[in-house]
Amino acid sequence: MSERREEERGRTGFSMKKNHNSNFNRRNQEQIHQKLPTKISGPLTLEQLCAYQHMFRIQEISSIIKSHSFEVPNARNRSPSPPPVYDAEGKRINTREQLYKKKLMNERFKLVEVVSKLIPGYSAPKDYKRPTTFQEKYYIPVSQYPQINFVGLLLGPRGKTLRKMQEDSGCKIAIRGRGSVKEGKTSSDLPPGAMDFSDPLHCLIIADNEEKIENGIKACRNIVIKAVTSPEGQNELKRGQLRELAELNGTLREDNRPCATCGQQGHKKYECPHRETFAMKIICRRCNQPGHTIRDCTSDSNYGKQIHSSRYNNEMPYHRTSTAVDQPSAYSRYGYTPRNHNGSSRFNDNSKYLNNGNKRATPQPELELETSHKRQQINPTSSSQDTLSHQTNHMTMTTIEDSGIDKLQLPAGMSNENPIPQPVNFNEIQINDVSGPNGTLEAPPGLDLGNNDSNITLQGPPGLN
């Protein structure tokens, strides 16, 4: 019954015809094959041996493609067949023979590229046509790391990262597979092949040579590795993409702007270590350092020495807070003088008490010479003829110690009662004796040195009365 049904359906003749064609191809294959010698008698170097093996395999593949004798491996040795794919006319384009032929052609292309580099001047087989495009798939580990947005990292802000990868590698990179298309997109909005969700998420890399394919795979792998290995929040690639996106949207807040307080970069104004606080405005009057008062000062320097730099009064030995005592004229308006007022301040320079009645923190030494000296003011006689007498009207004598005044040897004309000599009147000076030195020195004409008369007259030149 089964043989009869096969004859009715016409399958018996088809199977016989198929077997006849296979036998014919086998006989033709033996004639077409130009077998290269497999036994090499002469010595060859390692490079020559490698080149010969490549040439042998290229010739073998060319003969198989030319004879159309594609021997599909057994079911145990071949991979599972992919789902069938049909073209616009309804013909299947991914049969086992077609897939095997495509595999052989790719192998021959790689071998021709290697041999052309090893052997200069090598000519490929006549039926060989170099493919214009190559493509490869790089699968992304979405199932292992579902929390990472690989598509966003590969695309970048408005596709800038993907375009940069394509420019650097020289190939075309497209994201395909499940999860590569946003919801709401249709096939009319996307390029052909983008709606194919049969494969998992992957990068489709297309180029004109193998080197560019490898560069594209390496670029995609680097981004995936960086996204997987970087801790959360420390991915520099993602930070750069967010910054570029803010620049494109016009919402970027520049982080490299200098601080308004110190003018340096790297921190905000509220994080500035040099910002002025309330404590920085307080200046210690002892050490002139900001941040504390005199009570909290830990400086070992002398208070009396540091107080001279006070901005209130550099001459006061203590810190004075009241300014009313510096204005004695304020009391004169009311016609009275306060008690213990000496004209400049209600406290003497040698006072041991401050304004608040407390004793001085640092005692000041008293003047040692104040009790042992006498202050004496001398009013010299005025004279309108001498400049020296005019200057002495404003001169006051310093203190002279009583115990040492007797031991001093005063010059002539100076006594203890009148320490400053009287002014000299040069009009009263008389010449008693004018004599020349011993020797033969002669006086000028008209001058007689031997005459001791005080009425000496000088004679002028001849002709002058």
UniProtKB/Swiss-Prot annotation:
Q: Which UniProt keywords apply?
A: Metal-binding, mRNA processing, mRNA splicing, Nucleus, Repeat, RNA-binding, Spliceosome, Zinc, Zinc-finger
* This protein's name: Branchpoint-bridging protein
> What is the stated purpose of this protein?
Necessary for the splicing of pre-mRNA. Has a role in the recognition of the branch site (5'-UACUAAC-3'), the pyrimidine tract and the 3'-splice site at the 3'-end of introns.
Q: Which organism is it from?
A: Candida glabrata (strain ATCC 2001 / BCRC 20586 / JCM 3761 / NBRC 0622 / NRRL Y-65 / CBS 138)
Question: Which family is this sequence assigned to?
Answer: Belongs to the BBP/SF1 family.
Q: Spell out the InterPro entries in the cross-references.
A: BBP-like (IPR045071), KH_1_KHDC4/BBP-like (IPR055256), KH_dom (IPR004087), KH_dom_type_1_sf (IPR036612), SF1-HH (IPR032570), SF1-HH_sf (IPR047086), Znf_CCHC (IPR001878), Znf_CCHC_sf (IPR036875)
Kindly state a single biological-process term from the GO annotations of this entry.
mRNA splicing, via spliceosome
Q: Does the keyword Plastid apply?
A: no
Q: Which first-to-last residue range defines the signal peptide?
A: none
The record's GO CC annotations read: commitment complex; cytosol
State the residue spans of region: Disordered. Answer: 1-22, 324-391, 431-465
Q: Which gene encodes it?
A: BBP
Q: Where are the zinc fingers (CCHC-type)?
A: 257-274, 282-299
Task: Give one GO molecular function term.
Answer: mRNA binding
Localization terms from the record: Nucleus
Q: Which SUPFAM superfamilies match?
A: Eukaryotic type KH-domain (KH-domain type I), Retrovirus zinc finger-like domains
Query: What residue stretches are annotated with the KH domain?
Result: 139-205
Q: Does the keyword Cell inner membrane apply?
A: no
Q: Where is the composition biased (Basic and acidic residues)?
A: 1-11
Q: Which CDD domains match?
A: KH-I_BBP (cd02395)
What are the leading ranks of the lineage?
Eukaryota, Fungi, Dikarya, Ascomycota, Saccharomycotina
Spans of biased composition, class Polar residues? 339-361, 377-391
